[in-house]
Amino acid sequence: QSLVQTCPHCDTAWEPGPSGGMSIVPFFFPSGEEPTIYLPFWNLHCTASGFHLQTWADLVRLTNIPRVVLPWMESTSFSFRVPAFKIRPELFLALSSRLSLYQPTAEEREKLPGAHLHPVTLPREEAFQALPVVLGYLAPARKNLFPKILGGSLRPVQTRIEYLPFLEKPEEFIQPEMNMAIQKK
C-alpha cells in the first residue's frame, strides 16, 4: 500500500494526516522520452547544527567531494533526495548519492502523468533518519568527515515527494537523462 495516494480522475495526491487525508503537491522531473514508470523520491531540506550544510558549497567543503566550489554554489541551497520506496541498502545509498549530487529540477504539473506511479513505501521519517548515513556515503574520505559532524545533527525543514521518470525494460529501469539503470532483481 502506498503512503501517497493519487487520483487520476481529479489529478490530486493525498497522504495520511492526523485528522484524515492531507492534500499534497507531487513534483515530477521532466523527460525527453515518454516514461513507462515514475519512481518516487523524497526531497529533504534540512538544517544542520554543529556543522554547516545549507548550500552546495557547504556540502563540497564538508564532504570534500572532488568538485571546485563555484560562485553559484555559495547561494544555492542543498537538499538530499532519497528513494521513497524500500530497496536494498546498497542500492538505496547509491541512488540517494546519485540523485542528491545530480539535483535535477522537478516541476509541479497540472495533470498527473498517465504512466504508472510506483508506490511510496518508505515514510518520510525513515528517509530522514537515513540522512547521516547518506551524508557519510557522499564523502570520499569518510574518516575525514566523521570528526567534522561528530555531535552535530540534522533537522527537517521541508519535505516533498518527487517522481523521477524511467523506461521499463525486461531486466532494468532506465533513466535516460541521468544515464542511469536500476536492475529489477
Language model regions located:
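Long C-terminal interaction/binding lobes of large macromolecular proteins
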Residues: 2-185
